């Protein structure tokens, strides 16, 4: 059955029913951070800097140093105070560390963070419950972090098929007790077909003693209900690294794109401007003859975007920039009003004056505030005549 919702035809089946029918179910997520990455590359290109974001160095020490110091404003997934502290303790040295960090920093897996960090700092002290676990868990310092590791363990130690391993993963993640008990039995003792042939060999028939097998299954059971899909975490970690790389290697371009992406959020804009100051990037005030709609880069400095100013609309700014590019810079407040009279309103001009956007023109702010209404009225009258 289907239904129409806002001109879109959609199924009335639940996601579980869709999967049971063998149909493909996909989740599409929109990320503002992808726009920030794209805009950073475009801003850099304006200055003749070519950034091939698909071929950056994922082993740049400066990037990992920045992350380890907690300077992660604008870095995807790493902005929260808790995540900053985690990165400082973790001191990631490669993309795998970031991937694991993203997978661990959630309710449930957080309990495993101390053990993960301890093992990372002293890998020589890691003890595996069975030698076969080393190849599976060595990358995550002896800890089960991903769903894929659970599947790999039951396949390597107990001979499960890929399909059966995925069934175990689902049973663990959804806490299905009956299925879990069956999976435990099969994992430890194996499973035979009706004709007596071996379906899954099991740990004991694979030379692993019962006590060790029980303990390993308990570990999987404890973590699997929280375990993250590695492909999901890896996709996130690459976006994380790309944003961190751009911030580290092209800070002005990145921060300009970042601030432009949150121009409707005053608190975010202020926070990111403070981070610019922290990193030695000067943010120039708005200027009627220099500013664009968005934040832009001038040398190693950032110029304030006009659409960030309260009561200054996007369409008005587009018209302003177009007029400036066509007929040159504005020479005075009256020149500005005369050329923009069909687009402006008094509130917008007042806010531009108060923001300092006219400071480069003759006269003080107080003088401009005292006369701008009279200038606008006179230009309106002149236009009617």
Give the residues covered by each predicted segment.
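Noncatalytic, beta-rich nucleic-acid-contacting surfaces in large DNA/RNA-processing enzymes
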Residues: 1-385
């Amino acid at each position: 059955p289907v239904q129409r919702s806002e001109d879109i035809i959609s199924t009335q089946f639940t996601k579980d029913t869709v999967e049971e029918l063998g149909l493909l179910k996909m989740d599409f997520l929109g990320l503002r951070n992808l726009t920030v990455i794209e805009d950073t590359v475009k801003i850099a290109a304006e200055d003749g800097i070519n950034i091939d974001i698909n071929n950056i160095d994922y082993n740049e020490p400066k990037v990992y140093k920045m992350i380890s110091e907690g300077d992660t404003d604008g870095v995807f997934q790493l902005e929260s105070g808790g995540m900053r502290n985690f990165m400082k303790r973790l001191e990631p040295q490669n993309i795998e560390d970031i991937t694991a960090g993203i997978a661990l920093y959630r309710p449930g897996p957080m309990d495993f963070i101390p053990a993960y960090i301890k093992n990372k700092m002293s890998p020589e002290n890691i003890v595996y419950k069975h030698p076969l676990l080393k190849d599976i868990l060595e990358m995550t310092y002896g800890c089960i972090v991903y769903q894929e590791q659970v599947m790999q363990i039951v396949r390597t130690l107990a001979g499960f098929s890929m399909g059966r391993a995925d069934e175990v993963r689902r049973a663990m993640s959804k806490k299905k007790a009956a299925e879990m008990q069956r999976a435990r039995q099969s994992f430890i003792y194996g499973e035979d077909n009706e004709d007596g042939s071996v379906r899954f060999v099991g740990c004991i028939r694979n030379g692993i003693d019962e006590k060790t097998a029980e303990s390993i299954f308990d570990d999987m059971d404890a973590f699997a209900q929280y375990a993250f899909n590695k492909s999901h975490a890896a996709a996130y970690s690459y976006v994380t690294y790309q944003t961190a790389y751009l911030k580290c290697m092209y800070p002005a371009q990145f921060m300009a794109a970042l601030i432009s992406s949150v121009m409707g959020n005053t608190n975010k804009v202020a926070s990111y401007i403070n981070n610019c100051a922290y990193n030695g990037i000067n943010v120039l005030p708005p200027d009627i003859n220099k500013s664009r709609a968005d934040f832009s880069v001038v040398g190693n400095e950032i110029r304030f975007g006009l659409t960030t100013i309260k009561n200054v609309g996007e369409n008005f700014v587009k018209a302003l920039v177009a007029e400036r590019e066509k007929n040159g810079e504005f020479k005075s407040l009256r020149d500005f009003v005369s050329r923009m009279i069909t687009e402006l309103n008094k509130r917008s001009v007042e806010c531009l004056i108060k923001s300092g956007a006219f400071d480069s023109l003759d006269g003080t702010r107080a003088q401009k505030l005292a006369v701008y209404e009279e200038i606008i009225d006179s230009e309106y009258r002149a236009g009617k005549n």
